Amino acid sequence: MTHHTVAIVQYPPAVLDLRASVMRSVAHVTEAADAGARLIVFPETWLTCYPAWAFGMAGWDDAEARHWHARLLAESPVLGATADAADALADLRAVAANRQVTVVMGLNERSNTGGTLYNSILTIGPDGSTLNVHRKLVPTHSERIIWGAGDAAGLRAIDTPVGRVGGLVCWEHWMPLARQALHASGEEIHIAAWPETSDIHQVAARSYAFEGRCFVLSAGLYLAVEDLPEALREPFRIGVGPEAPASGLLFDGGSSVIGPDGHYVVEPVRGRPGIVLAEIDLSALDRAHHDLDVVGHSARNDVFELRVDARRRDGVVVRRD
């Protein structure tokens, strides 16, 4: 089967409330599944919001910045215990299994020891299990005061019932070697996770689809001022900057679906919350590869070689033998 319905969730999370956000995600997955979607995608750090307020606060030994960073840590899930009662995402896994859908969730991932956050993409299979976790390789610019650097353990496409799915976070789309690693893993559907989707982000998503000869689900966050706690509204406005989309909105969505020719299947949806749906046909990929295959007949493997260390980098390796 090559025809599939896919969906992007363009609703706001419950900011800094992990439990409430998970329950919202269950409702949104249910809505998308009711509409026929078999792959359901959320934007960058949807759990539990992109922390733009950090860019509007003092970053060094500032009590307010420390307070909100601690809140973000406390409301960010630790991944890895799919069957454990303490798994904060158990309800999301359950709805994925119940509806037999694949869910791709952007989230703030907390390390299982210490207090580091990662900007991650979690892929949950239709049995509720973790299929992949990709951690953003290099947090962009001032994001480095929030997130640690990821590794290449999740830099791959994985098999799902709707095709081979991979993803990158925001400015990773301007990392040519990361793109090539995903192309080489046989990616058919690419998740481009963003907080905002300005014109240049749309250029990157469309270019990725054309280069990789794949479908791209470009997921943008929808967030209004009233979605934030009162104390975070002004720092968030400062963090977003002067290009906030409209009065009352901080991020206006802009989610889209792009075909392997780089043209829109669904043009950017801006200024309203909802589920963005699209029908895709994977047989289009073979036709698109007729004139471009960046890891095949358009490549020069005798000239260029890319090496990727795909080990999970935990820093401390303990041997007891």
List where the protein language model places each region.
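C-terminal beta-strand edge segments of enzyme domains
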Residues: 157, 221-321
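Conserved beta-strand and immediately adjacent loop positions that scaffold enzyme active sites
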Residues: 5, 104, 120, 154, ...
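Extreme N-terminal starter segment of soluble prokaryotic enzymes
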Residues: 1-8
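Active-site catalytic loop in hydrolytic enzyme cores
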Residues: 81-84, 89-90, 94-97, 101, ...
